[in-house]
Design a protein with these regions (language model features):
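A conserved beta-strand-loop-helix scaffold within acyl/acetyltransferase catalytic domains
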Residues: 43-179
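Acyl-donor binding region in acyl/amide transferases
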Residues: 1-58, 163-187
Length: 187
């Protein structure tokens, strides 16, 4: 599960650090100024933000995430996955990753996947084209698709990154193939 919203990049911060409390107080003030009906964010287990937000009166749930800090040993990374995630990866052994999906094909695939779920897309085609043009110019985006032996797209994801992190920005999967392990392979 990706981490959405606010997270602290300084790994040296702990929940009893006064800087965390200050950051969270400022964040809570900004939320108040927005006049939102509610605010929802997932925090990774062990995040120093959790206790600080609880102290400010927020209901907070921690969630196990697959925020991968070090990719130097992929075997170790996979060993840390849950049994369910490993089982999904086993199912995906006959599938392959493709990096040749174009932005237009990705958009159409995402629209189709959402339509199957009786949902509508939350961004315009034009927005995605501008985002893609800018991130491609910087060399900071990639579309991954998972295909079967018949070259059908089962799942896809639009990834962007900066010098610190990669973001699994827009994932989508075809409901017909939800049990194929394709979405696990994207991670």
């Amino acid at each position: 599960t990706q981490i959405g919203g606010v997270w602290l990049a300084d790994a040296s911060l702990s929940s009893n650090d006064s800087r965390v409390a200050e950051i969270c107080q400022d964040f809570a003030r900004q939320l108040e100024e927005l006049g939102l009906s509610y605010y929802y964010q997932q925090y990774p287990t062990g995040s120093p933000i959790v206790e600080a937000m609880r102290a400010l009166g927020f209901k907070v749930k921690e969630r196990i995430t697959y925020r991968i800090e070090d990719l130097s040993n992929l075997e170790q990374v996979i060993d840390a996955f849950s049994k369910n995630k490993k089982r999904q990866l086993q199912k995906a052994l006959s599938l392959h990753v493709d990096t040749n999906m174009g932005i237009e094909e990705f958009y159409r695939f995402h629209v189709q996947c959402l339509r199957e779920q009786s949902k509508q897309i939350s961004y315009s085609r034009e927005f995605l084209l501008v985002l893609n043009r800018k991130t491609q110019r910087l060399g900071q985006s990639q579309i991954l698709s998972i295909r079967n032996a018949d070259n059908e797209v089962l799942a896809a994801a639009y990834l962007v990154w900066d010098k610190h992190s990669m973001y699994y920005l827009i994932p989508c999967y075809d409901l017909k193939y939800k049990d194929s392990g394709a979405s696990a392979l994207l991670v």
